[in-house]
Every structure is written in structure tokens, then in C-alpha cells.
């Protein structure tokens, strides 16, 4: 009886070790499809995750939260924000072999109202987002020229406008 229990325990430990090793191998081989930069606004997070899933990313991306996304990168009041973002992109590239950065702005953004007050209409705000996304994307390309930068804006009705991609 003792011998059978020991054999079963040994088999269980071997099986657990094998599962653990397989899990570790999966973790080592993990490549993320993208590095997603989203705003901290809680109203849009679920819709952004749903959009990324719909586009085939599931949750296979690294995520970074930055108030205002593009304006958060471009504003000068808190220069450490962009510095920290660029450091995280480099880490993601090194660890998870990302090939793309996705900048996901949204309209009705408090950071835009804080750093760029004065727009009066949805279209004025949208135009400002497009302008700031271009500047932010160019900054990212200057730091990591081998990565694509995809820029998009979520509208009030939760539709997503894919603005442009820098290759």
C-alpha cells in the first residue's frame, strides 16, 4: 500500500512539474501583438477592450494608461509622462517583441480640456486629436523607428475612427 501511494505521489509530482515547465515555456515564448496606450477615463475602458478583442488582439497586448494619450505625450507640464511611456515601450519591445504601438484617444477627454482648453465643438476636438496624434506618433517613431504606430479615436457613440498608421 505504501509503495503504491509513493508511486502515485511521484507521478503527481512529475505531472505537476511537467505542467509547471510547460507554463514557464509558454511565458518565455510570449509575444504581444501590440503595445496599447489608453486614457485613464473609466468610461471608455470596456469599449476599448471590446474593440481590441474584435480586431483580433484578445488580451494579447501590453497596456499603458496615460491621461489624454496623445496630449499626455505631447504636453510639456509633465515631461516625465512621455519619458515613462517611451521606457515602457522599450521594455515591452524587449520582453514581448511588440511590432506595433496603438494610440487610443477618445473624445470628451478631460486631459484635452485641461491642456488645450478652447475647442467648442466635437469636430474642433476631433481635429485637435488628429493633430496631436500625428505629433505623438512621430515622437514614438523617432524613438523606435522599427515599430508601427496606429492611431485611433473613440467617438461619443463608441465608434472607433482609425485615423492613420505610421509604418
Say what each PLM segment does.
Residues 49-56:
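Short Gly/aromatic-enriched secondary-structure transition segments
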Residues 30, 57-60:
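A short, polar/charged loop/turn motif at coil->beta-strand junctions and beta-hairpin connectors
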Residues 106-108:
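Short, ordered loop/turn segments at secondary-structure junctions
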Residues 59-69:
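A short beta-strand-loop structural module common to alpha/beta enzyme folds
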Residues 3-48, 67-83, 91-100, 110-167:
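Divalent-metal-activated hydrolytic enzyme cores
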Amino acid at each position: 500500500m505504501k509503495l503504491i501511494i509513493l508511486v502515485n505521489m511521484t507521478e503527481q509530482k512529475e505531472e505537476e512539474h511537467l505542467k509547471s515547465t510547460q507554463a514557464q515555456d509558454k511565458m518565455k515564448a510570449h509575444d504581444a501583438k501590440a503595445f496599447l496606450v489608453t486614457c485613464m477615463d473609466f468610461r471608455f475602458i470596456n469599449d476599448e477592450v471590446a474593440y481590441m478583442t474584435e480586431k483580433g488582439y484578445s488580451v494579447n497586448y501590453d497596456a499603458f494608461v496615460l491621461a489624454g494619450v496623445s496630449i499626455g505625450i505631447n504636453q510639456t507640464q509633465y515631461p516625465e509622462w512621455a519619458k515613462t511611456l517611451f521606457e515602457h515601450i522599450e521594455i515591452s519591445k524587449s520582453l514581448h517583441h511588440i511590432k506595433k504601438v496603438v494610440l487610443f484617444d477618445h473624445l470628451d477627454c478631460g486631459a484635452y480640456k485641461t491642456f488645450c482648453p478652447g475647442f467648442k465643438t466635437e469636430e474642433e476636438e476631433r481635429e485637435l486629436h488628429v493633430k496631436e496624434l500625428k505629433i505623438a506618433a512621430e515622437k514614438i517613431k523617432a524613438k523606435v523607428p522599427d515599430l508601427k504606430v496606429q492611431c485611433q479615436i473613440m467617438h461619443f457613440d463608441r465608434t472607433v475612427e482609425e485615423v492613420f498608421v505610421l509604418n
